[in-house]
Amino acid sequence: KRIWKKALLLVQFVATGFLVTMLVFVARQYTFMVNDRPGYAYENLAYCGLAGVDSTSRAKILDEVMRLPGVAAATTVYQLPFEHASGNNILLPGGTQELFNIADLYWVGNGYLDMMEIPVIQGRSFTENVTNSREVMVDRRFVEKMKLVAGWTDDVVGKDICVTEHSKWNEEPFTICGVYENIRLGGISNQDMRPSVLFYAHKPMYTLQVKFHELTNDNMARLQQKISETFPDRELSAISFRSEIMDLYKDSRQFRDSVMIGGLVTLLVTLIGLIGYTNDEVSRRRKEIAVRRVNGATLWDILRLFIKDIGYICIYAVILGGGIAYFVLQKWQ
């Protein structure tokens, strides 16, 4: 019976070591995910989808929002960086061979790169307030890809490319005006590694993007109020970038919470089992304890009997549980 209780205690400590180790690693991974820099500054950004809103109304809300207190900048975009990006293919002017597929971020408005704090590492940003812009910006990955497939050098500014969907059968090339630093498209676990491109649009696009001096509840409330006043017949919501980015990792958060609950329950069961085992041992060894007390043993001497009895079991069990957790985490990642 005593051996059976020790075996059960061993299993409980292995489970505790496993779940505690899992919790530490998963919690650290989740913290890393939500605090990692994606290549753009999102802490003070918010957005509002304007799908179905006409161009005149989009221009109106953009103008109204820029006058709100606390707003540092506002623009419109077609694509948000954490959304899934559509693809188009790259060709050289006059050529028919499609070189590679890119993540097309489509159109952005005035001041987009400054708002996002995305560095321009070569050339310049778009010429703004142009009705039919023929400029395109590419990221660092695009430059590296063109060096491999087309033999280009690092200096790509001023060169022309054609992009399917935009260039109409390779008849309307775009001129590269600048190169921006790579940014993360999507989340860490499902990052889109394709090169990306940006186009400029003077006409307001379908997503309003706002940058605050500081993103506070009051500033978000004012933005939401202005949107609701401008479009009383529509249910449009202002959403912070941070909440959307955290939502990318909700599965990891839920897994972390599940492991935490499981770990706490297992720890509680283990403590109950340890207390029960200790009580049984005290009852079983009552005469031995009495003799030791008569011979001058202190309370600490008595406690050492039980610590020595189960201490090695606990240590080895926790190490074993941690090792199993590490193996599982390697497979999971």
Residue ranges: model-predicted function:
Residues F18, R28, K308-Q333:
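Small-residue-rich transmembrane alpha-helices
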